[in-house]
């Protein structure tokens, strides 16, 4: 199935795709998860980059991600390191940065590195869903 899972089934329920949320704040992960599940996405969670790497490489999750949403400042493996890992090992999986730090230089740097969007917390559910939909659309266009 490659790096993509769009249109796959979880049990009897079709989903719009699988998204991994990487953030050290449980409340943020919960809000993001609820916003994306409302739009029909299957959501995985990790509290830091180390757990994200474990999650993306584990069993049925391996290579079955459509989008990764990643915070920057986290313990253990931070977002910068996690994003570098994803870019190098899963180059077709779109990355969205979701951070509490509205830094234009940082945003520009990440966008130049191939991150598809840079969102600042708190983010509205609709804006988040739109960013994920755009990321998935870009990924699908890249497959053609």
For each predicted feature, which ranges?
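Non-catalytic signal-transmission and effector/linker regions of two-component phosphorelay proteins
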Residues: 1-20, 62, 129, 133-144
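The feature encodes the CheY-like receiver
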Residues: 29, 72-75, 99, 103, ...
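Charged docking surfaces used in two-component/phosphorelay signaling
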Residues: 30-38
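Acidic, metal-coordinating helix/loop segments flanking the phosphotransfer/catalytic sites
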Residues: 45-67
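Acidic catalytic/metal-coordinating carboxylates
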Residues: 47-51, 78-81, 99-102
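Short amphipathic alpha-helix used as the core "switch/output" element in two-component signaling
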Residues: 54-57, 80-92, 109
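C-terminal output helix
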Residues: 105, 123-132
């Amino acid at each position: 199935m490659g790096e993509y899972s769009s249109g796959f089934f979880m049990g009897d329920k079709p989903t719009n795709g699988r998204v991994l949320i990487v953030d050290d704040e449980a409340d943020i992960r919960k809000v993001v998860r609820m916003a994306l599940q409302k739009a029909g996405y299957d959501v995985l969670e990790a509290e830091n980059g180390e757990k994200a790497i474990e999650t993306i490489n584990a069993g049925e999750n391996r290579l079955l991600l459509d989008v990764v949403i990643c915070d920057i400042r986290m313990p253990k493996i931070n977002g910068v390191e996690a994003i570098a890992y994803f870019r190098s090992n899963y180059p077709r999986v779109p990355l969205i940065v979701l951070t509490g730090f509205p830094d234009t230089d940082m945003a520009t740097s990440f966008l130049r590195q191939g991150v598809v969007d840079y969102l600042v917390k708190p983010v509205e559910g609709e804006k988040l869903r739109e960013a994920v939909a755009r990321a998935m659309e870009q990924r699908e266009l890249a497959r053609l």
